[in-house]
């Protein structure tokens, strides 16, 4: 359904014929407002008709009065004033009469339609489709006024029907194309060439209908949709104070006026038709009124005379929607089933349902909001709605079954239904709620004047087959004309000794099987006719049953989606559950999935969904979702997860969660801790990369001998974010990156050596002495903040732990560990010449450099591919998370593609890309770096990306797949040496990054890219974006000075700088140097301690 900007309704009114349904339907409107189907500021009113047979015209006048009264009160008036209509867009929806196939009427008849774009998952009723059509298709562009829409028809309207409102006044009807044959049983408009309505025919003659045929050979059908301008609505409203039209409103009823039945089309609108004379109008009567006594005719004549006075001068025009469709929802079961099983683009066979054996459903059947357990066979052209059935069950062709649950399944075992309508109803009899079951045939007529049939046979055949007699069904004084399905007391509602079930009507299909027992039980029951049953239907209980069943299947869906690792977004379901009070069962389901998961990825996603539920419960209040997650109250659940005890961990999380549900701020903080728990499971999954970390023993360097590693930076050309856990092992990742020197230098490095003191000396800072941070660790306690990324020297401390030099949980103190294994301690210094948050992969490459230097200083050689996996492990120990692309691109030389498969253990495989001769130099001539002067840590963006990935937002899932696909195309462009094509991929890569992490493009950066665009084949921010370095492929070679001049002329770009960049053919380099007793220019006595 279309979800573009639509009408911002001032008031929406839903009229209904039963006063005990008003609150029920008011709640349904409010639910739709919470689902964002209705604007938040719209006034919602469910209004009962003054009388059950007030007619569509009377219901419209009454609704208009109620709307004006509420708007007048809101505006501060003490009397009803029509002035409030001048700035109001009002929508009146008419529920209409009872419908034999749905206890809540045609408006709430569920359709086999899903709306994947809806922010909240929900069944789609006819009301929802009509609301969408009125709000987003027919309504936009209309001036203030009153739209009236029946709900007794199915409509289809193109996204932009092209309705012009220029110079409009009066009233306007919307018409849809229909065949001449269809029009014989419906209403049609006769118009002139200007679109003015000349006449309205209902079930007209062939000659009348022929006059209405348009150039397309079709006729304009009366659709039930009307618009009244403010002027016309004021004239209509003015009639409510004068007899006899005052009787159409609740005010008239409260004043004791005699009820009058009025038709919207054949009373109110017909008097505006140009060909209608006053005499003919006053003498006529609407088709729904039928033939009555003279008093009624006289009363109606007075009402029509008043309408003529008020409305005759108002023009009535028609808009014809040639590409639209209209279908009245008749009481013909065959036609009803055809509408619900007709294949079409938007129609799914299984809608909001969980079916264990879908292969048993035949092609043209429809299942809506059902749970089908075991073998349930459904034949062609059959429909199941709102049922929870347990097989074995066989339902053949041409059936409609609704409102049954598992308790009623047994009644269907051993039967095969064909061409029947079986429904379960919630009725309230003398204040008690009970279930009643009705049975009818597909060919039966629900009209009073219809053919005398029941269960697809004549009454005489039915009496003969079942033993039932006519006096069982009708009183002796009931005239033959009134003896029909509607009045027959067929349906048991109370048995003196037992509860009733579907078997109390199903026996009529095979009476001989029951040897008279069923007939005796049937006769012993209190029975009602269909007409008698309708006022007893409890619509609140009906809708509650449907809602409970919907969420029952939705919880099963959630469980299946998670356990089967499906890429379906659960956020709409979460919003639905929270919005309609089902958050508790959903949380319990997610707990079960997480606790029972064999795969840490499934458990982590389930915990992420719990965080989403808690965030949704906070309703946008309580602060940002991202934030700290180390409150002491959550330590115990986290410790269980860290130890691998998933079941106890999930249980402890749920127990703690109960204490945090009372207000939005606590809910948000609880959500953050669930994301913290999810991160523990991600860490455990990524830790599997340790399988691919191995070292070889080599000669131990002499004490004091430096091991120095140097590394280039990296530039990512395609596929970034796909390397990020859990995407890297759930979808699989592929990233193309370049190892690069910046301004001719390899900006990242580390050096390590053994020292005689059994201590760890750490230094972080530039390669030279100034601004160096120095730390000495003399005990294990000095290392315990290794997992706090912002703690001084945390990365270096984590490197010692991951390299296996220090064992934090050993009983031996640090001094003894170092002396026992190495006869002394270590000194480690790391440096980067790049600014913090550069986007060039600094921290991961630095971790690789530090690990390589440390391992070699400890007498171990580690290969580059092992080092790539070791950095993954280190970053999980450090708790920064992150993917593998930085170390792949910075530790390995040149141009390469790294790949990981959708599996655990997490393994990264690297392919070096061979390019044409001379193309590397061409890249060097055309590739430039621009420092934007802005920094943003990738972690700030990472939490949002992970949250959206675990939610499986369609845009994120699709984009992640595109990232991986484009990496392979980009690699091919490098192999071909196609610079312009690489520029195109670079530009689309930047668009993909922005889709993945909205907010990664600061305004100043956007301005800078706009300035540079004419000079570049393509450009992107490095890494996750948000700031740092921008890189671009220039159209001309060696453009550093040119771009500096261009940027200098632009205003407001801040502290930028342009840098040369070249592909590094070496990658990580390691060398052993001579002795040096100095630690970055400071002796041990000058070094601080932690």
From Swiss-Prot:
Keywords: ATP-binding, Kinase, Nucleotide-binding, Transferase. Disulfide bonds: none annotated. InterPro entries: GDP_fucose_pyrophosphorylase, GHMP_Kinase-Related, GHMP_kinase_C_dom, GHMP_kinase_C_sf, GHMP_kinase_N_dom, Ribosomal_Su5_D2-typ_SF. This is L-fucose kinase. Its EC number is 2.7.1.52. Isoform 1: Expressed strongly in brain, ovary and testis, moderately in kidney and liver, and weakly in lung, spleen and heart. Isoform 2: Expressed very strongly in brain, strongly in ovary, testis and kidney, moderately in lung and liver, and weakly in heart and spleen. Takes part in the salvage pathway for reutilization of fucose from the degradation of oligosaccharides. It catalyses: L-fucose + ATP = beta-L-fucose 1-phosphate + ADP + H(+). GO terms for cellular component: cytosol. Belongs to the GHMP kinase family. ATP binds at residues 834-845. The lineage of its organism: Eukaryota, Metazoa, Chordata, Craniata, Vertebrata. Pfam families: Fucose_pyrophosphorylase, GHMP_kinases_C, GHMP_kinases_N. GO terms for molecular function: ATP binding; fucokinase activity. The keyword Manganese does not apply. One of its GO terms (biological process) is GDP-L-fucose salvage.
């Amino acid at each position: 359904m279309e979800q573009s900007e639509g009408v911002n309704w001032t008031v929406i009114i839903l009229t209904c014929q039963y006063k005990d349904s008003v609150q029920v339907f008011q709640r349904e409107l409010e639910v739709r407002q919470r689902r964002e189907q209705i604007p938040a500021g719209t006034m919602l009113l469910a209004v009962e008709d003054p009388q059950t047979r007030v007619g569509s015209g009377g219901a419209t006048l009454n609704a208009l009065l109620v709307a004006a009264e509420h708007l007048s009160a809101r505006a501060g008036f003490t009397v009803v004033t029509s002035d409030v209509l001048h700035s109001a867009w009002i929508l009146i929806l008419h529920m209409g009469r009872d419908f034999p196939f749905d206890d809540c009427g045609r408006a709430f008849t569920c359709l086999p339609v899903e709306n994947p774009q809806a922010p909240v998952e929900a069944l789609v009723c006819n009301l929802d489709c009509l609301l969408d059509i009125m709000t987003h298709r027919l309504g936009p562009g209309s001036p203030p006024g009153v739209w009236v829409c029946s709900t007794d028809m199915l409509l289809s309207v193109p996204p932009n029907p092209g309705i012009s409102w220029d110079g409009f006044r009066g009233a306007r009807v919307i018409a849809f194309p229909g065949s001449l044959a269809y029009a014989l049983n419906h209403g049609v408009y006769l118009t002139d060439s200007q679109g003015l309505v000349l006449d309205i025919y209902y079930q007209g003659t062939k000659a009348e209908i022929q006059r209405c045929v348009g150039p397309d050979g079709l006729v304009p059908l009366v659709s039930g949709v009307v618009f009244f301008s403010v002027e016309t609505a004021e004239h209509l409203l003015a009639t409510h104070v004068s007899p006899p039209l005052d009787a159409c409103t609740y005010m008239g009823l409260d004043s004791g006026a005699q009820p009058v039945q009025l038709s919207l089309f054949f009373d109110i609108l017909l008097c505006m038709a140009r060909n209608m004379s006053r005499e003919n109008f006053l003498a006529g009567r609407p088709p729904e009124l039928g033939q009555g006594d003279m008093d009624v005719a006289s009363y109606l004549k007075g009402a029509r005379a008043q309408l003529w006075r008020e409305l005759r001068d108002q023009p009535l025009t028609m808009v014809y929607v040639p590409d639209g469709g209209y279908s009245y929802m008749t009481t013909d079961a065959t036609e009803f089933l055809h509408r619900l099983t007709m294949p079409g683009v938007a129609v799914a066979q299984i809608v909001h349902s969980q079916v264990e054996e879908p292969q048993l459903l035949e092609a043209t059947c429809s299942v809506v909001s059902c749970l089908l357990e075991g073998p349930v066979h459904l034949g062609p052209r059959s429909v199941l709605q709102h049922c929870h059935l347990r097989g074995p069950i066989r339902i053949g062709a041409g059936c409609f079954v609704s409102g049954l649950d598992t308790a009623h399944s047994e009644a269907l075992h051993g039967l095969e239904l064909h061409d029947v309508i079986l429904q379960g109803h919630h009725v309230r009899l003398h204040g008690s709620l009970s279930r009643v079951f009705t049975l009818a045939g597909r060919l039966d007529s629900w009209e009073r004047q219809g053919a005398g049939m029941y269960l697809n046979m004549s009454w005489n055949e039915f009496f003969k087959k079942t033993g039932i007699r006519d006096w069982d069904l009708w009183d002796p004084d009931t005239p033959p004309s009134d003896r029909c399905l509607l009045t027959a007391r067929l349906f048991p509602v109370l048995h003196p000794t037992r509860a009733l079930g579907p078997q109390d009507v199903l026996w009529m299909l095979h009476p001989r099987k029951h040897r008279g027992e069923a007939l005796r039980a049937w006769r012993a029951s209190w029975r009602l006719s269909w007409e008698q049953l309708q006022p007893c239907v409890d619509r609140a209980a009906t809708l509650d049953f449907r809602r409970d069943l919907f969420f029952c299947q939705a919880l099963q869906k959630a469980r299946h989606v998670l356990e089967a690792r499906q890429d379906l977004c659960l956020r709409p379901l979460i919003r639905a559950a929270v919005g309609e009070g089902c958050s508790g069962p959903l949380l319990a389901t997610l707990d079960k999935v997480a606790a029972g998961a064999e795969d840490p990825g499934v458990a982590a996603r389930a915990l992420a969904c719990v965080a989403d539920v808690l965030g949704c419960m906070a309703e946008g209040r309580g602060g940002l979702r991202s934030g700290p997650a180390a409150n002491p109250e959550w330590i115990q659940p986290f410790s269980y997860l860290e130890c691998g005890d998933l079941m106890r961990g999930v249980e402890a999380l749920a127990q703690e969660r109960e204490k945090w549900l009372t207000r939005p701020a606590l809910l948000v903080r609880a959500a953050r801790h669930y994301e913290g728990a999810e991160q523990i499971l991600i860490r455990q999954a990524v830790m599997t990369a340790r399988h691919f970390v191995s070292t070889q023993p080599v000669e131990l360097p002499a004490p004091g001998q430096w091991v120095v590693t140097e590394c280039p930076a990296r530039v990512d050309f395609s596929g970034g974010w796909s390397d990020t856990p859990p995407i890297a092992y759930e979808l699989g990742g592929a990233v193309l990156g370049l190892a690069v020197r910046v301004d001719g230098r390899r900006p990242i490095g580390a050096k390590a050596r053994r020292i005689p003191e059994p201590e760890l000396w750490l230094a972080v800072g530039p390669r030279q002495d100034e601004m160096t941070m120095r730390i000495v660790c003399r005990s294990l306690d000095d290392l315990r903040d290794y997992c706090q990324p912002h703690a001084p020297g945390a990365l270096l401390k984590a490197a010692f732990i991951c390299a296996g030099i220090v064992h934090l949980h050993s009983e031996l103190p640090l001094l003894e560990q170092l002396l026992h294994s190495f006869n002394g301690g270590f000194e480690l210094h790391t440096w980067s010449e790049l600014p913090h948050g550069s986007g060039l992969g600094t921290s991961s490459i630095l971790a690789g450099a530090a690990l390589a230097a440390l391992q070699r200083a400890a007498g171990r050689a580690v290969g580059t591919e092992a080092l790539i996996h070791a950095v993954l492990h280190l970053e999980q120990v450090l708790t920064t998370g992150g993917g593998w692309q930085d170390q792949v691109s910075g530790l390995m030389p040149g141009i390469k593609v790294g790949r990981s498969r959708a599996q655990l253990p997490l393994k990264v495989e690297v392919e070096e890309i061979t390019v044409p001769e001379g193309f590397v130099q061409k890249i060097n001539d055309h590739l430039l770096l621009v420092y934007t002067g802005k920094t943003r840590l990738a972690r700030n963006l990472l939490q949002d990306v992970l949250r959206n990935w675990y939610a499986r937002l369609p845009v994120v899932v699709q984009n992640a797949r595109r990232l991986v696909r484009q990496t392979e195309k980009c690699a091919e462009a490098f192999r071909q040496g196609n610079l312009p094509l690489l520029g195109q991929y670079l530009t689309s890569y930047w668009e993909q990054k922005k889709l993945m992490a909205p907010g990664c493009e600061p305004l100043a950066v956007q301005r800078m890219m706009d300035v540079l665009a004419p000079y570049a084949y393509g450009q992107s921010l490095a890494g996750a974006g948000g700031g740092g370095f921008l890189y671009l492929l220039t159209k001309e070679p060696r453009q550093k000075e040119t771009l500096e001049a261009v940027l200098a002329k632009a205003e407001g770009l801040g502290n930028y700088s342009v840098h040369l960049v070249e592909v590094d053919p070496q990658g990580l380099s390691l060398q052993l140097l001579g002795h040096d007793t100095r630690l970055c220019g400071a002796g041990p006595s000058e070094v601080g301690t932690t």
